[in-house]
């Protein structure tokens, strides 16, 4: 799955939350958005998932504009993201958390996938 963000902007009234973001996430990559509080990470992810309507700009997933409801529903069934609001158990390691959530969501070949991620 390839995600392409073109000229993405989001305004809340007169406040500019996201300004002219452009990037591509290629199939098979694992990507994170990093930055200080309030810089627009969560807003950007919300727009990528079609949960927040951009003020301008476009999100394409596999060359399909997610503004189209049918495209968005089909595409988002195949996407995953880890919310910044999920509270992970503090006593578990990263690997243990991946196992817990992988089992919860029925991930196939879980141990192999975790091993690859932990390299």
Predicted features along the sequence, with ranges:
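Walker A (P-loop) phosphate-binding loop of ABC-type ATPase nucleotide-binding domains
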Residues: 36-40
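Helix-to-loop junction immediately C-terminal to a conserved catalytic motif
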Residues: 49
């Amino acid at each position: 799955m390839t995600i392409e963000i073109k000229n993405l902007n989001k305004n809340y009234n007169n406040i500019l939350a996201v300004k002219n973001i452009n990037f591509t996430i290629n199939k098979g990559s694992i990507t994170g958005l990093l930055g200080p509080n309030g810089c627009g990470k969560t807003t950007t992810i919300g727009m990528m998932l079609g949960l927040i309507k951009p003020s301008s700009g476009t999100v394409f997933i596999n060359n399909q504009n997610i503004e189209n409801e049918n495209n968005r529903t089909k595409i988002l069934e195949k996407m995953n993201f880890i919310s910044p609001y999920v509270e992970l158990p503090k006593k578990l390691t990263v690997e243990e958390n991946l196992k817990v959530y992988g089992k919860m969501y029925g991930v196939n070949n879980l141990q192999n996938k975790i091993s690859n991620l932990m390299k």
